[in-house]
């Protein structure tokens, strides 16, 4: 599954949880690797379902928001404690014709990108 996704997205690197350390440990490995890269990195879990043209779409968003942590996934059921806030932000975005919402924190680790200058803060 992970290898198929990596191939589909032409990923530069892949981090597999071969020792059952868990998602958090694997995100830490990926973020540590990202901290050593000169280019911005997108971290995506193997169960993500990227849209067609994801690489180009993601690049457009990262160009648009170079200094922001960008999440490319918004769940409609999890985490439950954020659903009301998400709904409120979506209503505001709809009224203002915005094509994005902002939150004060990352609430999903499915697919995200941290600006290179902030990766060490996340670690």
What are these regions (language model features)?
Residues 1-44, 48-123:
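An acidic/histidine-cluster motif and surrounding catalytic segment
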């Amino acid at each position: 599954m992970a290898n198929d996704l990596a191939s589909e997205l032409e990923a530069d690197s892949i981090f597999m949880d071969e020792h059952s350390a868990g998602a958090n440990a694997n995100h830490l490995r990926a973020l540590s690797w990202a901290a050593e890269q000169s280019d911005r990195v997108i971290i995506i879990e193997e169960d993500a379902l990227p849209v067609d043209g994801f690489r180009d779409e993601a690049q457009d968003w990262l160009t648009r928001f170079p200094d922001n942590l960008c999440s490319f996934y918004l769940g409609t059921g999890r985490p439950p404690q954020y659903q009301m806030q998400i709904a409120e932000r979506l209503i505001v975005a709809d009224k203002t014709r915005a094509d994005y919402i902002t939150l004060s924190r990352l609430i999903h680790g499915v697919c995200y990108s941290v600006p290179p200058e902030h990766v060490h803060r996340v670690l």
